[in-house]
C-alpha cells in the first residue's frame, strides 16, 4: 500500500501544488456553465473544413455576465482541428476576440480561444463533450500546470440563414500563450524529447492522469510528422530549469473516459477496447512515481466530487463514469494491482538505469 508518509509528502511535489483560482483569468475562475450566443456565417465556416486555406469570418458573441446582464462582443471564427475537423458534423472552432473590446469584461485578457463542440447533434454527443471537459477539469484538480476551461451553453445562429439555429453544450480552452504567462513558462519548440530532458515529477503526474482517463493518444517524447513535440502535449520550460521540459496535455476525445464512437487504442498495444487501461508511462527515478501516486491519491475525494456534482451530466453517464474513475483509484490503492498494472509496465527501464549509473559515476553533473 502507499504509506501515509507518502501521502503527506505531497507538499514537496512542487509542480502539482494548488494555485488560487484568482490567478487565472476571470473567464476561468468560475465553473458554472456560461450562457452565450454565437451569431456568424457558420455554414460558410464549416464549408472550409477540407480547404487548405481556412479564413476567419466576422460575427458576434453575446453572453450573460455574472450580474445577469447581456454583453455583446465582436468575434471572428475559423474552423480548426485535425481529425474532428474532417470527421465531425460539428467541427471545432477558433474564436478570435478584439483585445480592445474585452477589457473590463468577463473575457478580459482573452484573444484567441479554442472552442470544443460536440461531434454530432444529439444528447449522446453532448454527454461525450461533457466527459472530455471533465477530463480537463480533472487535470486542473491535480495541478495548476493545466489548461483552464469554461463550460458554455452555446446557441449557434447562422447570420446568413443558411442553416437552422441550435443550442449545445461546448467549452473553451485557455490559450497556450496565456497559460505560459500565468505560470511564467516558455514554450519549448522542439522536435522530440530525450528522457533526461523531461521534468520527471510533472511527467509522472501527466502519465498517471492519462492512465486515469485511459488515454493512449499522446506522447511526451515525439510529435506527429512535421509537427513540434509532442503529440497532444505542449512542452514548456521555466527559466531556472531551462534544460527540463514540462509537458501539459490536451485533446482527450480518444480516451476511454469519453469513449467516443470513433476512438480505438493504438494497434501496437495488447488491448482491443479504448476503455481498457494500459499504462504507457516512462520509468522514473526512485521516489518520483511514488510521490506522484501519493499526490493523485490525496486528490481522490476532490476528483470524485467533481463527477458527482456536475449538473449537466446525466444520471446514467454519472454512475457509469464514477465507477470507471473509482476503478482507477482501486489500482493505485492495491499494492498488487499497482505493481502489475503500473510499475511493471513502465517504459525505458534500461535507459533510466544507464542514466542513473552515469550520474552516480559523475556526481558533478
Can you describe what each PLM-predicted range is?
Residues 1-10:
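Sec-dependent signal peptide recognition
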Residues 9-20:
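Hydrophobic h-region of N-terminal signal peptides that target proteins for export
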Amino acid at each position: 500500500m502507499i504509506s501515509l508518509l507518502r501521502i503527506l509528502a505531497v507538499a514537496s511535489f512542487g509542480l502539482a501544488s494548488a494555485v488560487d483560482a484568482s490567478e487565472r483569468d476571470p473567464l476561468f475562475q468560475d465553473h458554472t456553465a456560461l450562457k452565450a450566443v454565437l451569431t456568424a456565417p457558420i455554414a460558410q465556416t464549416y464549408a472550409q473544413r477540407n480547404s487548405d486555406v481556412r479564413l476567419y469570418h466576422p460575427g458576434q458573441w453575446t453572453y450573460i455576465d455574472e450580474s445577469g446582464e447581456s454583453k455583446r462582443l465582436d468575434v471572428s471564427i475559423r474552423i480548426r482541428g485535425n481529425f474532428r475537423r474532417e470527421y465531425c458534423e460539428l467541427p471545432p472552432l477558433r474564436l478570435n476576440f478584439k483585445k480592445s473590446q474585452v477589457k473590463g469584461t468577463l473575457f478580459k485578457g482573452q484573444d484567441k480561444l479554442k472552442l470544443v463542440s460536440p461531434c454530432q447533434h444529439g444528447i449522446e454527443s453532448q454527454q461525450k463533450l461533457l466527459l472530455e471537459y471533465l477530463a480537463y477539469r480533472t487535470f486542473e484538480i491535480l495541478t495548476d500546470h493545466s489548461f483552464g476551461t469554461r463550460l458554455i451553453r452555446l446557441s449557434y445562429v447562422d447570420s446568413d440563414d443558411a442553416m437552422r439555429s441550435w443550442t449545445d453544450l461546448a467549452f473553451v480552452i485557455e490559450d497556450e500563450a496565456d497559460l505560459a504567462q500565468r505560470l511564467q513558462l516558455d514554450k519549448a519548440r522542439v522536435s522530440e524529447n530525450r528522457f533526461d530532458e523531461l521534468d520527471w515529477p510533472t511527467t509522472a503526474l501527466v502519465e498517471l492522469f492519462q492512465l486515469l482517463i485511459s488515454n493512449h493518444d499522446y506522447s511526451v517524447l515525439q510529435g506527429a510528422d512535421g509537427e513540434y513535440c509532442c503529440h497532444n502535449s505542449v512542452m514548456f520550460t521555466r527559466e531556472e530549469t531551462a534544460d527540463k521540459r514540462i509537458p501539459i496535455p490536451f485533446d482527450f476525445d480518444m480516451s476511454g473516459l469519453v469513449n467516443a464512437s470513433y476512438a480505438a487504442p493504438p494497434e501496437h498495444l495488447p488491448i482491443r477496447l479504448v476503455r481498457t487501461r494500459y499504462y504507457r508511462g516512462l520509468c522514473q527515478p526512485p521516489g518520483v512515481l511514488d510521490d506522484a501516486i501519493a499526490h493523485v491519491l490525496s486528490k481522490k475525494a476532490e476528483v470524485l466530487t467533481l463527477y458527482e456534482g456536475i449538473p449537466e451530466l446525466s444520471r446514467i453517464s454519472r454512475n457509469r463514469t464514477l465507477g470507471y474513475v473509482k476503478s482507477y483509484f482501486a489500482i493505485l490503492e492495491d499494492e498488487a494491482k499497482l505493481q502489475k498494472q503500473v510499475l511493471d509496465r513502465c517504459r525505458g527501464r534500461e535507459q533510466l538505469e544507464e542514466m542513473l549509473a552515469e550520474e552516480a559515476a559523475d556526481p558533478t553533473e
